[in-house]
Swiss-Prot record:
One of its GO terms (biological process) is DNA replication. Residues 587-664 form the BRCT domain. The active site is at K122. Belongs to the NAD-dependent DNA ligase family. LigA subfamily. NAD(+) binds at D32, K33, E34, Y35, D36, S80, L81, R144, E178, K314. InterPro entries: BRCT_dom, BRCT_dom_sf, DisA/LigA_HHH, DNA_ligase, DNA_ligase_CS, DNAligase_adenylation, DNAligase_N, Hlx-hairpin-Hlx_DNA-bd_motif. SUPFAM superfamilies: BRCT domain, DNA ligase/mRNA capping enzyme, catalytic domain, Nucleic acid-binding proteins, RuvA domain 2-like. Keywords: DNA damage, DNA repair, DNA replication, Ligase, Magnesium, Manganese, Metal-binding, NAD, Zinc. Its cofactor is Mg(2+); Mn(2+). Its EC number is 6.5.1.2. This is DNA ligase. It catalyses: NAD(+) + (deoxyribonucleotide)n-3'-hydroxyl + 5'-phospho-(deoxyribonucleotide)m = (deoxyribonucleotide)n+m + AMP + beta-nicotinamide D-nucleotide. The keyword Cytoplasm does not apply.
C-alpha cells in the first residue's frame, strides 16, 4: 500500500508539473500520449487504493452536480477599485498621492521612496479568491461577493487547468485573480452549444456560478492572478516582489507588467493597452495602476470602499452604429412624458440592443438626433444603452423629432416645465391613474391587500375610477363584473379598502405620491409636524429643517400642497372616512432612543413589521440600508448582505437576545 501511495504522489507531482508546462508556459516537455499514459496509471491506482490526493489532476474532472452554493468568509478583504474615466482624473489621483507622501516625509525620518507605479491590464471576467493552506494545497476558492463574504466555487475552479491544485509554499495565503473565458474557448463552446453564449464575461461568470460541474468544465476557462490578499508568510516589500512570488508559485499570470515613474509613462502604457485590446484572446475593459511600494500603500490607506493606492482606468465603453427607427413617448406617475429611442436591433457587447433612453428634447437637440439617422449607441459601463450622437453623413435623409403637444395616451394638451413635458390630466390619463392607484394601495402606503396593476387597470377601464377617492366608492356588485373577480375575491378587496381607512399619518403622506418623498421622508415629516394640517400649511423654510430634506424636496412638498386639485382630493378622502392618525407616545429613556437601526435576517419573536413598530416605539429610526451613520444592525437568522456591510463598516451588531436584554 505504501509503495502505491508513493507512486501516486510521484505521478501527481509529475502530472501537475506537465500541466503547468503545457497550459501556463505553453512549453510541454512530454507528448500528449505520454501524459495520457501516466494519467491513466494514476486513475487505476486511485481506484485500487480508494485514495485520492486533494491536489490530484483527476480532481479537475467535473462529474457531479452540486446542491447549492455555500458562503465563504475571506481571510483578507477583496477591495473594489476606484475608477478614472480620463487622464485628468488619473492625474488628480496621482497628485493626492504625492501630497500625502510629501506630508509624511516632512514629518518622518523614515522617508518613503519616490512614487513608482505598476500598470497591468484590467481583465473583464469574474474575480476569484483561491486559498492555499500551509502544505500548499488549494483548499478553497470563492467569488468576491461583498468583498468580505463570497460563494464557495472550489469545485468549479478546479476545472480550470491553469490553476495549480498544489504550490510549493508552507504558509496560508489567499491569492486573488480573474477567471476568464478566452475568445478561442468561447468559439469552440458555441460550435456545439444548443444555446450559444453571447459574451465572454457571461460565459465565465455563468460557468463558475453553475452547480453542474460538467458544464463548468466544458467552458474551458482560464485565469490570471495578480494579488496576494492574505499572507501568513514573510511580508512583501513591493508589488513587484508579490507578483514574482505569484509567478514562482506556478499561478498563471499575464506577461504584461509595466513599471512607471510618472504620469506621462502611465499614459503611454494605457494607450498601448487600448491599442492592442482588439488583438487579445480575451476581454479587457481598462488598465489597473497601483503603487509599487508596500509601505507607501500603508501610509496612503483606504476609503470605505477603495484602497487609495490603486485605481482602475476605464476605457471608453464600446460603441456601435445603428438606425433610429422611431421615438416612443411614455407617461409616468407624475405625468412626465419621456422619450425612448426605438432602434434597428444591433448586437453590442453580446447583448441585442433595441431601445435606448433619450432624456428629454434638450438632450435630443444637443446630440442632433433625428429619425432615420444613423446613431452611435454606447452601453455605458457596458450595461445601459445610450445614444451618444449621430453619423453626420446620415442626416440628409433624416427627419426632425417633434416633441408631442398632446399626451400619447389621453390626448390632453401637454405643458412644458423646464426641459420636461407633462400631462396634467391626472384624472383620465390611464398610465398616471393606474400607477397612482397602485402606489396608493401598496404595502408601504395604504396597504390594501390583494391589489395589483392589472386590478388597477380594470378599475380604470371598466369602473371608470378617475381618482384615488373613487376607490372608497366601489361596490361589491361592480367588482363582480370584472375579469376573475368572484364573490370571495370581491368581498376581500372591499374589506381591504375599508380597513385601510384607519391608517397612520406617515403611510397616508407617502400614499399621496408627493414627488421626491419616500416612506422615510414621510415619517420624518410626521415626526416634525405631527398633523396633516400642519404638513399642508408648512413653509419651505420649515421643511428644510426636517432631516435629509433639501431645497428641491422641500419645494416639491410645498408645491404639492399648493395644488387646489390635490387639496380637493385629500378633503374628499377625509369625507369618505379615511382617518390618518398620529400617536405621539411618551418614550422612556432606552439605549435605542434616537439611534438609527437596520434589521436583517429572520427574528424569532417579531415579524418584520412588528420589529419595525417596536423600534419606532423606542424612539429609534429604522433604516433599510447600512451606512456609516447606522448605530446598530439587529441580526436574526440567515442575515443578508446588510450584516456583511455592517462588519465592513464596523457598525455595532446585536442579536435578538441582546436586543431583548437591552430593553428589559
Amino acid at each position: 500500500m505504501d509503495n502505491k501511495l508513493e507512486k501516486m504522489k510521484e505521478l501527481v507531482e509529475e502530472l501537475n508539473q506537465y500541466a503547468y508546462e503545457y497550459y501556463v508556459l505553453d512549453n510541454p516537455s512530454i507528448s500528449d500520449k505520454e501524459y495520457d499514459l501516466k494519467y491513466d496509471e494514476l486513475v487505476i491506482l486511485e481506484k485500487k487504493t480508494e485514495v485520492t490526493l486533494p491536489y490530484s489532476p483527476t480532481q479537475r474532472v467535473g462529474d457531479k452536480i452540486l446542491g447549492e452554493f455555500s458562503k465563504y468568509t475571506h481571510k483578507g478583504r477583496l477591495w473594489s477599485l476606484d475608477k478614472a474615466q480620463n487622464m485628468e482624473q488619473l492625474i488628480e489621483w496621482h497628485n493626492r498621492n504625492l501630497k500625502v507622501i510629501e506630508q509624511y516625509n516632512s514629518m518622518s525620518e523614515d522617508k518613503l521612496p519616490e512614487l513608482r507605479y505598476i500598470v497591468t491590464k484590467k481583465f473583464d471576467g469574474l474575480t476569484v479568491n483561491c486559498t492555499y493552506d500551509e502544505n500548499g494545497i488549494l483548499i478553497k476558492s470563492a467569488t468576491r461577493g461583498t468583498g468580505i463574504i463570497g460563494e464557495d466555487i472550489t469545485a468549479q475552479i478546479k476545472t480550470i487547468k491553469t490553476v495549480p491544485l498544489k504550490i510549493k509554499n508552507n504558509h496560508v495565503i489567499e491569492v486573488h485573480g480573474e477567471a476568464i473565458m478566452t475568445k478561442t474557448a468561447f468559439e469552440e463552446y458555441n460550435k456545439a452549444a444548443q444555446v450559444p453564449l453571447k459574451n465572454l464575461r457571461n460565459g465565465a461568470a455563468g460557468a463558475l456560478r453553475n452547480l453542474d460541474i460538467k458544464e463548468t468544465a466544458r467552458r474551458n476557462l482560464s485565469a490570471f492572478f495578480y494579488d496576494v490578499g492574505y499572507n501568513e508568510g514573510p511580508e512583501f516589500k513591493s508589488y513587484r516582489e508579490m507578483m514574482n512570488f505569484i509567478k514562482n508559485m506556478g499561478l498563471p499570470q499575464d506577461k504584461y507588467i509595466k513599471e512607471c515613474t510618472n504620469m506621462e509613462e502611465v499614459e503611454k502604457e494605457i494607450e498601448y493597452i487600448e491599442s492592442i485590446r482588439g488583438e487579445l484572446d480575451y476581454d479587457i475593459d481598462g488598465a489597473v495602476i497601483v503603487v509599487d511600494d508596500i509601505k507607501t500603500r500603508e501610509i496612503l490607506g483606504y476609503t470605505i470602499k477603495f484602497p487609495k493606492w490603486a485605481i482602475a482606468y476605464k476605457f471608453e465603453a464600446k460603441e456601435i452604429t445603428t438606425k433610429l427607427l422611431d421615438v416612443e413617448w411614455n407617461v409616468g406617475r407624475s405625468g412626465r412624458v419621456t422619450p425612448t429611442a426605438l432602434l434597428e436591433p444591433v448586437e453590442l457587447g453580446g447583448v441585442t440592443v433595441k431601445r435606448a433612453t433619450l432624456n428629454n428634447m434638450d438632450d435630443i437637440k444637443r446630440k442632433n438626433v433625428k429619425l432615420g439617422a444613423k446613431v452611435l449607441v454606447r452601453r455605458s459601463n457596458d450595461v445601459i444603452p445610450e445614444i451618444m450622437g449621430v453619423v453626420e453623413e446620415s442626416l440628409e435623409e433624416s427627419e426632425e423629432i417633434q416633441a408631442p403637444d398632446r399626451c400619447p395616451y389621453c390626448n390632453s394638451h401637454l405643458v412644458q416645465n423646464g426641459v420636461h413635458y407633462y400631462c396634467e390630466n391626472t384624472l383620465s390619463c390611464k398610465p398616471q391613474m393606474v400607477k397612482s392607484i397602485v402606489h396608493f394601495a401598496s404595502r408601504e402606503a395604504m396597504n390594501i391587500a390583494g391589489f395589483s396593476e392589472k386590478t388597477a387597470e380594470q378599475l380604470f377601464e371598466k369602473l371608470d375610477i378617475k381618482s384615488i377617492a373613487d376607490l372608497y366608492k366601489i361596490k361589491k356588485e361592480e367588482l363582480l363584473t370584472l375579469e376573475k373577480f368572484k364573490d370571495k375575491k370581491s368581498q376581500n378587496l372591499i374589506d381591504a379598502i375599508q380597513n385601510s381607512k384607519n391608517c397612520d399619518l406617515a403611510s397616508f403622506i407617502y400614499a399621496l405620491g408627493i414627488p421626491n418623498v419616500g416612506k422615510k421622508t414621510a415619517n420624518d415629516l410626521v415626526m416634525k409636524f405631527k398633523t396633516l394640517e400642519s404638513i399642508k400649511n408648512t413653509t419651505i423654510e420649515q421643511l428644510v429643517e426636517v432631516p435629509d430634506v433639501g431645497e428641491i424636496v422641500a419645494k416639491s412638498i410645498y408645491d404639492f400642497f399648493e395644488d387646489e386639485k390635490i387639496i380637493s382630493n385629500i378633503e374628499e378622502l377625509l369625507n369618505l372616512g379615511v382617518k390618518p392618525y398620529y400617536e405621539e407616545e411618551r418614550i422612556d429613556e432606552n439605549p435605542f432612543m434616537g439611534k438609527t437601526i437596520v434589521v436583517t435576517g429572520s427574528l424569532n419573536n417579531y415579524s418584520r413589521g412588528e420589529i419595525k413598530d417596536k423600534l419606532q416605539s423606542l424612539g429609534a429610526k429604522v433604516s433599510s440600508s447600512v451606512s456609516k451613520n447606522t448605530d446598530y444592525v439587529l441580526v436574526g437568522e440567515k442575515p443578508g448582505s446588510k450584516y456583511e456591510k455592517a462588519i465592513e463598516l464596523g457598525v455595532k451588531v446585536i442579536n435578538e437576545e441582546e436586543f431583548s436584554n437591552k430593553i428589559k
